Regions:
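Conserved phosphate- and dinucleotide-binding cores of soluble alpha/beta proteins
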Residues: 2-28, 32-41, 46, 51-57, ...
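Structural beta-sheet core signal
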Residues: 128, 151-153, 184, 291
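Glycine-rich beta-strand-to-loop/alpha-helix junction loops that act as flexible
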Residues: 128-133, 294
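Short, hydrophobic/glycine-enriched beta-strand segments
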Residues: 127-128, 218
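HTH-adjacent hinge/linker in prokaryotic transcriptional regulators
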Residues: 11-18, 50, 55-127, 138-148, ...
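Conserved beta-strand termini and adjacent loop/short-helix elements that scaffold enzyme active sites
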Residues: 94-97, 154, 185-187
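Short Gly/Thr/Asp-enriched flexible loops that form oxyanion-binding sites at enzyme active sites
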Residues: 133-144, 231-241
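A generic alpha-helix surface/boundary motif
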Residues: 35-36, 77, 110, 132
Length: 330
C-alpha cells in the first residue's frame, strides 16, 4: 500500500474512538519511546506529517500521553520520615525550599496532586475546599486521574465580591480532570446571621451536600493565612479590621473558613455560627485528610492543624516542615 492510498483512505476524524485511540498510542510509542521523527513516522504509517502532529497533540489532550515536568526541588525523605514520626501522619510530602514562594507553591501542589491521584484504591468520593492553593493543585492533576470521581465542595464558596482570580470553582476543576462530576455547596461561605445559616442547613439540597461532604473518605484542603491576602478578605466575607481583631483574640488562620487559635480551637464563635460547611473536627474521621500549605504566613495555622489532628497527610515546603519540627511543642 502506497502512502498516497493510505492518506486518501484515512478520514480527518476516524469514526471509531477506540480505533483512533489505538492509532494515537501507536504514533506516540514511535515518537516518545522509539524516538522516531514525525517525518519518519509519517513514512512508516502512511500518514502526513500534519496528521502525525495532530495525533500526538490529541494523545496528550485525552491522557494517552502524559508529560510530567519533574521539579528541581526534590522530596526530602529524611524530613518526611521525621514529620510522620513526630506528628503521627500517614504521609508527609516535603519539597526542598527554593526561596521563591511561587515556585514552592507549584512543586508542593504538583506533589500533592500526584499523591491524591496515586491513592489505591482510587477514592470514588473526594471532598475539597476552595482557594488559590487548591486551584493550583487542580491544575497539576493528571488527565483522567480518577475516572468518574465524585468531587464535593466542603464549604460554601460563592464570592460576594467580584475578584479577578476565581477561587471558588475548585470542585469542578478536580472533577473535570478526573472525568467525573462535582457536587457544589451553592451558598456563601459566611452568612449574615446564625438564623440564616440554620435555615439554609434545613434546606434539603444544602443538607444533602453537607451529608455528602461528611461522608467523603478523602478531604483535601489548604489552611488560610491570617492577613489581608486571605481569600476570605478578597472575597468580601471579612475585612482588614476584623482580621486585626481576630489576631488580637489569638487567631492564627482559618481551616475550612473557620478561624482557629494555636490549638486549632474556634476563636470567634460569632463568626463561626454564621459559617456553613464541614466543621474542622469532622476532618479527624477522614481516611485521608490532606492538608496543603506553603510559606511562612501559614506556619502557625499549619501547626494548629497538626496539634488538633485535623490532618493525617501534609504536603508542604522544607522551611515549613523545619518550623513545625522545631516549634511544634511550643
Amino acid at each position: 500500500m502506497t502512502s498516497a492510498s493510505t492518506n486518501d483512505s484515512l478520514p480527518s476524524r476516524l469514526n471509531s474512538d477506540p480505533q483512533r485511540e489505538q492509532l494515537m498510542a501507536q504514533v506516540a510509542k514511535l515518537y516518545y519511546d522509539l524516538e522516531r521523527t514525525q517525518g519518519d513516522i509519517a513514512k512508516e504509517t502512511g500518514l502526513t506529517r500534519w496528521q502525525v502532529a495532530r495525533l500526538l497533540r490529541e494523545a496528550r489532550e485525552v491522557g494517552i500521553v502524559r508529560i510530567e515536568i519533574i521539579p528541581r526541588s526534590p522530596r526530602l525523605p529524611h524530613l518526611e520520615a521525621e514529620m510522620q514520626r513526630r506528628f503521627g501522619l500517614r504521609e508527609a510530602i516535603v519539597l526542598a525550599s527554593s526561596g521563591d514562594e511561587d515556585v514552592e507553591l507549584n512543586v508542593v501542589t504538583q506533589a500533592a496532586g500526584r499523591y491524591l491521584a496515586g491513592l489505591q484504591p482510587p477514592p470514588q468520593l473526594v471532598g475539597v475546599s476552595w482557594g488559590r492553593t487548591m486551584i493550583k493543585m487542580a491544575q497539576w492533576l493528571p488527565p483522567r486521574w480518577n475516572d468518574g470521581v465524585h468531587v464535593v465542595l466542603l464549604n460554601g464558596a460563592i464570592n460576594i465580591r467580584n475578584v479577578a482570580e476565581q477561587t471558588n470553582n475548585v470542585a469542578e476543576r478536580f472533577a473535570h480532570a478526573g472525568n467525573g462530576h462535582a457536587t457544589l455547596l451553592p451558598v456563601p461561605a459566611m452568612l449574615g446571621s446564625e438564623r440564616t445559616r440554620e435555615a439554609l442547613e434545613q434546606d434539603h439540597i444544602v443538607a444533602d451536600v453537607l451529608r455528602i461532604a461528611d461522608e467523603a473518605p478523602v478531604a483535601c484542603f489548604s489552611m488560610g493565612e491570617l492577613s489581608e491576602r486571605s481569600v476570605l478578605v478578597e472575597s468580601g466575607y471579612v475585612d482588614a479590621a476584623i482580621m486585626r481583631d481576630l489576631e488580637k483574640r489569638g487567631a492564627v488562620g482559618d481551616i475550612l473558613g473557620r478561624f482557629v487559635d494555636e490549638s486549632g480551637e474556634i476563636v470567634a464563635p460569632e463568626l463561626d455560627s454564621r459559617t456553613i460547611g464541614l466543621r474542622p473536627e469532622r476532618l479527624r474521621d477522614k481516611a485521608f485528610s490532606i492538608g496543603v500549605c506553603v510559606g511562612e504566613s501559614k506556619h502557625r495555622v499549619a501547626r494548629a492543624c497538626l496539634r488538633a489532628r485535623y490532618i493525617n497527610v501534609l504536603a508542604t515546603d522544607e522551611a515549613t516542615a523545619r518550623f513545625l519540627l522545631e516549634h511544634g511543642d511550643e
